[in-house]
């Protein structure tokens, strides 16, 4: 049976574009009857072993894990991960970039769950300069990039641009970074 995807075959994986991945997710939700919230739960939980392995190999293994979340479904994946880290007793902090009211339904439900648990979290306005990201990342064992994911169709600017620039700089300096979906500095349409 052939595939409608134009994905590129690699040794182990088929690579797809952002629009193709969105189509696969929609097909899974609609045709197979798997709710979006369950996909989000699976994606967030699947990040846990990799985050813990990266933390163990970090020179700052006892430092806090920072989960950087945007206001889309990719951010929702990060919120699920944050809940699981908190349940495991792992030192972590969730930073939501943007307004809570901008979260889609499934992500908002996960934000509410995280708040009910009392997990360390904060909301940062997109245009905020209140955080010195470079300084914060020196106190971080692993940064989880759940900011933009496959839905990005515009230029990165403002607070996101400053955050991503600091994240890339810190990564070059040794910070462990794990992306949910794809790194925010990559364009998903290619």
Question: PLM features: residue spans?
Answer:
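Glycine-rich phosphate/dinucleotide-binding loop and adjoining beta-alpha-beta core of small-molecule
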Residues: 3-16, 58-190
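Positively charged, low-complexity intrinsically disordered leader regions
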Residues: 2-61
């Amino acid at each position: 049976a052939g595939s409608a995807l134009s994905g590129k075959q690699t040794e182990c994986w088929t690579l797809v574009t952002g629009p193709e991945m969105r189509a696969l997710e929609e097909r899974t939700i609609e045709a197979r009857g798997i709710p979006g919230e369950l996909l989000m739960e699976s994606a967030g939980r699947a990040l846990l072993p990799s985050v813990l392995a990266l933390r163990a190999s970090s020179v700052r293994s006892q430092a806090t894990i920072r989960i950087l979340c945007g206001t889309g479904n990719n951010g929702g994946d990060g919120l699920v991960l944050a809940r699981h880290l908190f349940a495991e007793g792992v030192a972590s902090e969730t930073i939501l970039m943007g307004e809570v009211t901008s979260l889609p339904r499934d992500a908002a439900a996960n934000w509410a769950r995280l708040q009910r648990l009392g997990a360390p979290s904060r909301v940062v306005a997109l245009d905020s300069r209140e955080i010195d990201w470079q300084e914060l990342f020196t106190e971080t064992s692993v940064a989880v990039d759940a900011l933009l994911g496959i839905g990005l169709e515009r230029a990165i600017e403002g607070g996101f641009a400053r955050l991503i620039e600091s994240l890339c700089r810190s990564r070059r300096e040794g910070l462990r970074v794990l992306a949910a979906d794809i790194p925010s500095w990559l364009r998903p349409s290619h």
